[in-house]
Amino acid sequence: MKPLLIFLIAGEPSGDVLGGRLMAALREAMEGHVEFAGVGGPRMAEQGLQSLFPMEDLALFGLAELLPRLPTLLKRLDQTTKAVLERTPDAVVSIDAPDFCFRVEQRLRRAGARMPLIHYVAPTVWAWRPGRARKVAKFLDHLLALLPFEPPYFEAVGLPCTFVGHPVVESGADAGDGERFRRRHGIAPDATVLTVLPGSRRSEVTKLLPDFGATLEILASRYPDLQVVVPTVPGVAETVAEAVQSWPVPAITLLGDADKYDAFAASTAALAASGTVALELALARVPAVIAYRIHPVSHALYRRFIRVRYVNLVNIMLDRPLVPELLQQDCTPDRLALAVDRLLNEPSARQEQIDGVTEVARWLGQGDVPPSRRAAEAVLNVITKRVIADRQGQTPGRSRS
């Protein structure tokens, strides 16, 4: 049997993780009768992908960073489109990175490409720019959604969309060992552990670290045994390590997910920047306070165009402020300390969050079929429907699968 050929496109680290897991799930489902081509990073390379070019070439930031790299990006756009047309894969699966991926897929449609075009990670039309749903429906065949409430937004405009579950479910966030963490780092069994997560981008880290340090100064007077743990990532590790030296409480900095998830299991509560880590904390059942601070002009624009009331997906999914969000002018040491103190001091407040996030974790797919396997099944189902339609002579130039 001739193996399937799947062309994958990932443009950023989170997409590379999704791509690597999807490739593994496809290989398992097809018992090895599948080949891969496309663009990806180290996780996809581990699964056998030879990337057309370094995935880092597609990293897009602001306008100032984009303009000098525009010739390279246009070259990569041409290169990717040409590679798909030459290889004629059984399907194209693009993963997040919509600025690049959607341009490739639009070019493929204009060139008459007939293979299914599938996009993994639905655009957040429920939060802003709802008109994007109708636009992507013009060139995509299928969407794979991370959140359970997303499919109706796209099905309403005729684009099939499958909820596959959120990748955080496969992160291992709920598999940490708190006792192992305390032993490894010499933390007393009865010490109060607070995980502090100032973010992964330099801009957010530099804005939040001073407030977080001042917050800990307030908490230190109330909790003499307080032990702070600060998981970080390579891009900001040096900045974080330098900042925690002046904090009034002992702080352990960590690199790597395994130690981070053990820290979660050992923690009474967490203080975190808004982002995916809030979902990791939810899966690990760690009560949290979410903080964020951006430029006032950016915030004003955000409030004008964003259609949701919360920044944390837990609150968005529950449609209520279960997890405290302290943003902008509310993101002060006094208010942060008050919110964290409530979690550290009141078991009922912690349990209220744990009960709520347990429901969210179930909605995201925890305890069910792994998201990567669901995604693989959806991709193979789209391909199967296309093959059947081709045999019956019903494929006009694209399918709706």
Curated annotation (Swiss-Prot):
Annotated keywords: Glycosyltransferase, Lipid A biosynthesis, Lipid biosynthesis, Lipid metabolism, Transferase
Q: Name one Pfam family in it.
A: LpxB
Is Lipid biosynthesis found in the keyword set?
Answer: yes
Q: What is this protein called?
A: Lipid-A-disaccharide synthase
What does this chain do? Condensation of UDP-2,3-diacylglucosamine and 2,3-diacylglucosamine-1-phosphate to form lipid A disaccharide, a precursor of lipid A, a phosphorylated glycolipid that anchors the lipopolysaccharide to the outer membrane of the cell.
Q: Which family does it belong to?
A: Belongs to the LpxB family.
Report the superkingdom from the record. Bacteria
**GO biological process terms on file:** lipid A biosynthetic process
Q: Please tell me the species this chain comes from.
A: Rhodospirillum centenum (strain ATCC 51521 / SW)
Database matches in HAMAP family: LpxB
Under InterPro entries, the record lists: Glyco_trans_19
Does the keyword field hold Glycosyltransferase? yes
Q: What are the EC numbers?
A: 2.4.1.182
List, alphabetically, the GO terms of the cellular component aspect. Answer: membrane
MF terms from GO for this chain are: lipid-A-disaccharide synthase activity; phospholipid binding
The reaction(s) this protein catalyses: a lipid X + a UDP-2-N,3-O-bis[(3R)-3-hydroxyacyl]-alpha-D-glucosamine = a lipid A disaccharide + UDP + H(+)
**Pathway the protein acts in:** Bacterial outer membrane biogenesis; LPS lipid A biosynthesis
